[in-house]
Amino acid sequence: MGTKRTDDDDSPPPPGVKRWIISCDESGTGGKPFYGFGSLWSPDQRRGDFAAMITDLRERYRYPYEIKWNKVNDANLKFYKALVESFFKTNYLAFHCLVVRMADVDLTHHSGSWDLARQKHFTRLLTNKIQRCLTAYPERAQTFRIWVDPIQSSYGKADEVVEIIANHVLKKLFGQVRSVDRVFTRDSKDTPSIGLCDVLLGAVMETWQKDSQREAKVELRQWIADHLGWPSLNHDTHKNEVKFNVWYFYDPTAGAPRAVKTEPVKLKYPLPQTVRRASNR
């Protein structure tokens, strides 16, 4: 989105407030059949645990480089498989993405602009998931901080627009002011949570695009699918999935058949009952 706001701060949330860090990335802006947005969710209070996990993996597998889907190869596959395994074993992390088929997008609803369409879909992903989180835990004071890798857009302050629109939508639903406290641009090279989001989103999108590349990537895609109990990543999930959620933005009025089949998730490492119960509210 060409975002410029980078003055993030590490100050803790107010006492009694649970802050979520939502690390975001995009994929498929190069004219491919689908584009998508991913979001990795983590409690702000677990930042230290996440950093320690990444440091341990880097040292164990001697991988000091940027975490990124396009960096996956035979030489570093063990690191990326361990990273994925750690994600699925870590209950406080969750991945939610939105996939849009370009052929289903009616640009007359977006002033003829792909930039605007993508911005709306990105904001829709965030507001939908934040709404579900606020609804699941109505007794809890929550706020949401969003980190985005610079996303392609002709508009230089798109992060601020996302923040304004998201808060407007959420205020109408919940009467709360500034559920999204800020949206910041973060360099993915220095932000492993965005890197992990990029890896998970890249695996989903490459499968949907039918864009097989390196054998290592194919193996990592299957590794992720195995942790979901799926034959492949060529599926979307039911809306209540918490750990790994693929939202296919399908428009049945467009006349085209669904691109994929919805598949129940059977996690290799099941979530605690309390987390699963909250997802069904």
Question: Which stretches of residues belong to each language-model region?
Answer:
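Phosphate-ester processing/binding pockets and catalytic centers
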Residues: M1-R281
